[in-house]
């Protein structure tokens, strides 16, 4: 894996975490 692949993987993980957080916040309200 090169740095570009790692950066893309990290960005995808961040986006998934933000979507999960948003879903949890909507569920709690």
From Swiss-Prot:
Subcellular location: Cell inner membrane
Any single GO BP term: dormancy process
Organism expressing this protein natively: Escherichia coli (strain K12)
Induction and repression of expression: Part of the SOS-response regulon, controlled by LexA; repressed by LexA, induced by DNA damage. Antisense sRNA IstR-1 inhibits toxicity by inhibiting translation of tisAB mRNA; subsequent RNase 3 cleavage leads to a truncated mRNA. IstR-1 sequesters a standby ribosome binding site in the tisAB mRNA; as the levels of IstR-1 decrease during the SOS response this site opens and ribosomes are able to bind to initiate translation further downstream.
A molecular function (GO) term: monoatomic anion channel activity
Keyword Membrane: yes
Listed transmembrane segments: 6-28
Disruption phenotype: Competition experiments between isogenic strains with or without the tisB/istR-1 region were performed. In the presence of DNA-damaging agents deletion strains were disadvantaged and were almost extinct by 4 days.
Pfam family, one: TisB_toxin
Name of the molecule in the record: Small toxic protein TisB
Gene transcribed to yield this protein: tisB
Annotated keywords: Cell inner membrane, Cell membrane, Membrane, Toxin-antitoxin system, Transmembrane, Transmembrane helix
Annotated membrane topology: Single-pass membrane protein
Function in brief: Toxic component of a type I toxin-antitoxin (TA) system. Overexpression causes cessation of growth, induces stress-response, a number of membrane protein genes, and leads to cell death. Inhibits ATP synthesis, ATP levels drop drastically quickly after induction. Part of the programmed response to DNA damage; damage leads to increased accumulation of the protein which slows or stops bacterial growth, probably allowing DNA repair before cells continue to grow.
Entry keyword annotation includes Hydrolase: no
Record lineage: Bacteria, Pseudomonadati, Pseudomonadota, Gammaproteobacteria, Enterobacterales
A single cellular component GO annotation: membrane
């Amino acid at each position: 894996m090169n740095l570009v692949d790692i950066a893309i993987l990290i960005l995808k993980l961040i986006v998934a975490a933000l979507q999960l957080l948003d879903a949890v916040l909507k569920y709690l309200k």
